[in-house]
Amino acid sequence: KPTKPNSHHFFNIKNKSIFTHIKLNIYPDGGVARIRIYGNMKINKQFGKKVINLTSVLNGASPIACNNEHFGRAENILAPGVGKNMGDGWETRRSRGKNFDWLILKCATAGKINKIQIDTHHFKGNYPDKCSLQAAYLNGKISAKSIVNKSKNWKLLLSKVKLHAHKKHNFKNKLMKNKKVNYIKINI
């Protein structure tokens, strides 16, 4: 479709097919600053019984909602590998009241949690003192607002634990060992 210089262009696509690759052709030539393709991931059933990172963006996990993204985007914690710096993680401005900061993630696929890793790499003076995790298995299409409201009553996946600066914290799932989950709430 024809476009104009120095502007954003949005195109609605009605194709329901599943794609793994997109090719952008520009005619006759020129430059494109950014391309963003929005859509929903189709979960690959090849995982089967294989142990995978249920909260990896590469496997299809996504952030649903959070209460604060003052210094870093919540979606950053889903990225693969080790963070480059603090800006490459999720950082809040810290709640000073009795409430805590939280983030809700939709898992790549429903699964049973074996182990949990909370990484505070690069966070030396501003790591969360404690954290807890809640989880649930929710069926059907549910709005983000409804998920946030329901999350207040989710079961504990990890009881409140002390965290430390610049460290990978590893935990075994003892509270919901044989329960299937597809949403996780991080409380810090």
Give the label of every model feature segment.
Residues 107-109:
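A short glycine/threonine-centered beta-strand motif
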Residues 1-102, 112, 122-188:
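Trp- and acidic/polar-enriched beta-sheet ligand-binding modules for extracellular glycan
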